[in-house]
């Protein structure tokens, strides 16, 4: 499979700490509840993609952590949430980050809590250059046949450190299939079983790629 343009999304992480004021759970009016503020923040952050990002663009904001307290009868001082953001375009990535910061600041003011927000950019989006992608398409078609090459399928919301190479030089990230057998699972899956029959296709592809590239140089 070969993409012209975005292939894999960026992978960013964020953490937010909500500091309130602990109190006995039977007397919540004596404190500032960070759990309540955190729950409202989780819901509010879901509006970032839904109401800030152009529907024709793609972005994901997933909350994956919520930690607060360890007793049934105590409102804790602090709640912590965290998660991940995925996007393909740098401007969408920045837009999501800024919207999250704005919501965190406003939510702290609304509940009288102190909300700290930290956004950490990870792998950038993996974006193929068109010329190199079309070159790779031709080579793949020579090796496997045109019907075996998927062109511009839906990109992945995963992440890939090859993106750093593509920021420095034009290039192309390609996918090599594992075949239709039982071992064909998604990435990071314990049931994945590499199909040795795919090796000759991979080797032939890279050899042909070098031959064609040097011939055109």
Model regions and ranges:
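Metal-dependent amide/peptide-bond hydrolase catalytic core
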Residues: 36-217
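Fold-level recognition of mixed alpha/beta catalytic cores in primary-metabolism enzymes, strongest
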Residues: 1-43
């Amino acid at each position: 499979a070969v993409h012209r343009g975005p292939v894999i999304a960026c992978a960013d992480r964020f953490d937010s700490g909500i500091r309130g004021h602990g109190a006995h759970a039977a007397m919540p009016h004596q404190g500032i509840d960070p759990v309540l503020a955190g729950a409202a923040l989780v819901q509010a952050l879901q509006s970032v993609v839904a109401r800030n990002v152009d529907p024709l663009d793609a972005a994901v904001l997933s909350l994956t952590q919520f930690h607060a307290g360890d007793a049934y009868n105590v409102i804790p001082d602090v709640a912590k949430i965290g998660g991940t953001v995925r996007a393909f375009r740098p401007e969408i990535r920045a837009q999501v980050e800024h919207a999250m910061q704005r919501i965190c600041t406003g939510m702290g003011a609304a509940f009288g809590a102190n909300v700290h927000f930290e956004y950490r950019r990870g792998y950038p989006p993996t974006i193929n250059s068109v010329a190199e992608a079309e070159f790779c398409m031709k080579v793949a078609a020579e090796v496997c046949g045109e019907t075996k090459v998927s062109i511009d399928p839906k990109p992945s919301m995963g992440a890939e450190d090859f993106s750093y190479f593509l920021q420095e030089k034009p290039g192309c990230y390609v996918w090599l299939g594992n075949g239709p057998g039982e071992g064909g699972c998604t990435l990071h899956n314990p049931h994945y079983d590499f199909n040795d029959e795919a090796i000759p296709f991979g080797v032939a592809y890279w050899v042909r790629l070098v031959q064609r590239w040097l011939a055109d140089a």
